[in-house]
Structures are given as C-alpha cells and as structure tokens.
Amino acid sequence: MKLNDLSPAPGSRREKHRPGRGIGSGLGKTGGRGHKGQTSRSGGSIAPGFEGGQQPLHRRLPKFGFVSLKAMDRAEVRLSELAKVEGDLITVQSLKDANVIGQHVQRVKIMLSGEVTRAVTLKGIAVTKGARAAIEAAGGKFEE
C-alpha cells in the first residue's frame, strides 16, 4: 500500500453542494436561497451588526475609555532585557538598535524584573528604586 492508494472510507465524506444543478440535488432553481428578498440576490448580504433597522447593540451602548497618547511614546523595559544590548553604555537609541523597544518610543523606564549580569552605564533613562539598587549592586552607574 502506498500513499496514493489511500482513500476515505465510503460514506465518510459528503459531496460538496453544487447549487442550481437540478431539482434532484435539493438545491436546484433557487439554490437554497428561497424566493425573492435581499438575501436571494447576488451581493445581497447584510452588514455585520445590522438588526433590521433597530438601533444596533454597538450604538445602543455608551462609549467609554480613551487611549492615552503618553502610552504611545513610552516603554517599560525589564532588567533582564538589558542583556540583549551590546556595549556598556545603554541609551534609548541603543535599546532601539537591539530591538528591545519600538522605533516610536522616546522615553524608557527600567523595571526590576530579572537580573542584570554586568556593569552597565545608563544615559537618559528613568529607573525604578529597585532597579537602581540592582544595577548599582552589579557595578553599574547612571548619567543624566
């Protein structure tokens, strides 16, 4: 037996529907669309969320929340991610070059999560208290 000899068991697979191919198929003439009306026409689909003229759910419910523009240009970086950056001086640009943060980011804050394994110098980057203590314990320093 070879792969090209394999076939599904008889009766296990249904034949695909071919609408409009005779009354014996059960889908002749109108092709399962019924008589007249919007959905019987070609291209006659109804938009998602349309409720027949009743005010749709997504318009009945109130709006809420907003997107902070500050979140667009700020990023948080874990201590463990600093290992991805080559060199001892870490700046916003060096984090972008190492693909740790996105290209649109302008301000970065280092969070205490993971460990820092080498002494690094951070320039122009904000740091939490715990992260500052961990970096200084590893022999790192900060420049403004």
Swiss-Prot record:
Subunit details: Part of the 50S ribosomal subunit.
In the UniProt record, which is one GO cellular component term? cytosolic large ribosomal subunit
**Which InterPro entries does this UniProt record tie to the protein?**
Ribosomal_uL15, Ribosomal_uL15/eL18, Ribosomal_uL15/eL18_sf, Ribosomal_uL15_bac-type, Ribosomal_uL15_CS
Name the NCBIfam families for this protein.
Answer: rplO_bact (TIGR01071)
Which source organism? Pseudomonas entomophila (strain L48)
- Keywords in alphabetical order, please: Ribonucleoprotein, Ribosomal protein, RNA-binding, rRNA-binding
Q: Which SUPFAM superfamilies match?
A: Ribosomal proteins L15p and L18e
GO molecular function (one): rRNA binding
Official protein name in the record: Large ribosomal subunit protein uL15
Q: Could you tell me what this protein does? A: Binds to the 23S rRNA.
Question: What family is reported?
Answer: Belongs to the universal ribosomal protein uL15 family.
From start to end residue, where is composition biased (Gly residues)? 21-31
UniProt region (Disordered), positions on chain: 1-57
Which PANTHER family did the record assign?
50S RIBOSOMAL PROTEIN L15 (PTHR12934), LARGE RIBOSOMAL SUBUNIT PROTEIN UL15M (PTHR12934:SF11)
